[in-house]
């Protein structure tokens, strides 16, 4: 898969969706070739439905995709990667919700995504974590990044890196995204030289 040309960006909200004050919305208006991957029921549905929605978006085009996932969507992306493949160049995985932890209620949407897949992702990725996220301890973020073969970025005290964090356009996140795209392109050039 060539990632030297055009890319498309898929914004994948977590449980409950990304409200109007979420950085996802700010990015939607400024990223080229950007589209939403929204669940029919962002507060419900099954893991299989979430994964199928991601698969439909990824395979809708042969243009390589950069997945930009938040919270539960990060875990859905990891589940997608264990069962499917498609033209994914990279993934920015922001505040993956640790669905294996005790905060998730037994009958909640989050528990439907257990266990968190701990297999390497077949594309370049960055996990972004906050130091005071109630849904993801830094040590667990480190475990996810290691298992997934991702780089870990600690973004400071920004809660769950969602609307409540008041990140607006989240310029630091755009830096991570630029780095991720650059890494994906460099890796592709390395493969082309082999």
Regions found by a protein language model. Give the residues of each.
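C-terminal catalytic histidine-bearing segment of alpha/beta-hydrolase fold enzymes
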Residues: 150-194
């Amino acid at each position: 898969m060539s990632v030297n040309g055009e890319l498309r960006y898929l914004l994948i909200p977590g449980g409950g969706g990304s409200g109007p004050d979420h950085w996802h919305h700010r990015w939607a208006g400024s990223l080229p070739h950007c589209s939403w991957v929204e669940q029919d029921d962002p507060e419900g549905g099954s893991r299989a439905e979430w994964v199928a929605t991601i698969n439909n978006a990824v395979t809708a085009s042969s243009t390589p995709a950069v997945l930009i996932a938040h919270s539960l969507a990060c875990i859905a992306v990891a589940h997608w990667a264990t069962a499917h493949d498609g033209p994914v160049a990279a993934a920015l995985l922001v505040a993956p919700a640790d669905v294996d932890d005790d905060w998730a209620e037994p009958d909640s949407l989050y528990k439907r995504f257990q266990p968190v897949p701990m297999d390497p992702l077949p594309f370049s990725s960055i996990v972004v974590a906050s130091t005071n996220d109630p849904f993801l301890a830094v040590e667990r973020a480190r475990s996810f990044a290691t298992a997934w073969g991702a780089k870990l970025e600690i973004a400071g005290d920004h809660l769950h890196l969602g609307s409540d964090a008041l990140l607006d356009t989240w310029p630091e996140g755009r830096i991570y995204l630029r780095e991720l795209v650059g890494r994906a392109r460099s890796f592709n050039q390395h493969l082309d030289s082999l």
